[in-house]
Amino acid sequence: NRPHHRPVAVELPHTPLAPQQPSHGAPAALATVLSAQGTPVTPDELVESVYLPELHGSLPEEMTATARRYRMLAYPLSGSLTSLLTEIAHGNPVLVMQNLGNDWFENWHFAVVIGYDLENKTLILRSGTTKRWDTTLAVFERTWARSDYWALLILPPGEIPASAGLLRYLQAAHDRETTGQADAALTAYRAASFRWPQETAAWLAYGNTLYAG
């Protein structure tokens, strides 16, 4: 990975806040990120894809699959606070999953991280119906840890996360290919071959997909 120089504080104020209906926090959070990345969509359009009535909520797998159906690259972050802050510093809001409950009561929640302040040790989220939710890093990490640090970056094909690792990125591109989006995968592989020009795996993936097409 390339070295990253993060500013002390960053906020992405133009990230929209999608309107949320009761129990539809996941569609709203996903709509927020998709819209921020140039794919305007409403939570109502996503409910059927991500909301599971029997669970009264959503699962990460549905969130990831739905992002791909909108022809976006769904890149799972490594689960470190460093990678999350790096993406925010580069202008990318990050979809996260938290458990706001406790040891005896689970309260799963999807939110979008849109800023941080390292001096004050705080994060800024689009959370539920709150456009600017401030929380401490300590509280966020505790609630985030309960989801095994699940975090998803959603980008247009061809854009590479600032914190990307080669194999993780190639896997995200391959997932596009296996869902019938070979053109989007090809765009991603091509970007990878330029980002990591010395890596044979990137060129092989690009060449094989180009040949198959």
Where is each model-derived feature located?
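Specific register positions within alpha-helical solenoid repeats of the TPR/Sel1-like families, i.e.
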Residues: 177, 211-212
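Cysteine-nucleophile protease catalytic domains, especially the papain-like/related folds used
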Residues: 2-80, 84, 90, 156-159, ...
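Short, charged low-complexity intrinsically disordered segments located at boundaries
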Residues: 58-64, 95-97, 115, 167-175
